[in-house]
Amino acid sequence: MTLDRTYPIFTVRWLAIHGLAVPTVFFLGSISAMQFIQR
């Protein structure tokens, strides 16, 4: 029953981490692409 209580917390934490990580990786990728295009 402890797994039933910690699972939603892990899911919300996983969504929060990926919700922040995906735009960050995309933002860093676009910045590096712009620098390569300028050079």
UniProtKB/Swiss-Prot annotation:
Localization annotation: Plastid, Chloroplast thylakoid membrane
TM regions (residue ranges): 14-30
GO MF entry, a single one: iron ion binding
Known cofactor(s): heme b
This protein's GO CC annotations: chloroplast thylakoid membrane; photosystem II reaction center
Binding site for heme: H18
One Pfam family recorded for the sequence: Cytochrom_B559
Entry's Gene Ontology BP terms: photosynthetic electron transport chain
UniProt KW keywords: Chloroplast, Electron transport, Heme, Iron, Membrane, Metal-binding, Photosynthesis, Photosystem II, Plastid, Thylakoid, Transmembrane, Transmembrane helix, Transport
UniProt cofactor note: With its partner (PsbE) binds heme. PSII binds additional chlorophylls, carotenoids and specific lipids.
Membrane disposition: Single-pass membrane protein
Subunit organization: Heterodimer of an alpha subunit and a beta subunit. PSII is composed of 1 copy each of membrane proteins PsbA, PsbB, PsbC, PsbD, PsbE, PsbF, PsbH, PsbI, PsbJ, PsbK, PsbL, PsbM, PsbT, PsbX, PsbY, PsbZ, Psb30/Ycf12, at least 3 peripheral proteins of the oxygen-evolving complex and a large number of cofactors. It forms dimeric complexes.
NCBIfam families for this protein: cyt_b559_beta (TIGR01333)
Job description of the protein: This b-type cytochrome is tightly associated with the reaction center of photosystem II (PSII). PSII is a light-driven water:plastoquinone oxidoreductase that uses light energy to abstract electrons from H(2)O, generating O(2) and a proton gradient subsequently used for ATP formation. It consists of a core antenna complex that captures photons, and an electron transfer chain that converts photonic excitation into a charge separation.
Protein family: Belongs to the PsbE/PsbF family.
Listed name of the protein: Cytochrome b559 subunit beta
Organism phylogeny: Eukaryota, Viridiplantae, Streptophyta, Embryophyta, Tracheophyta
Chain's gene name: psbF
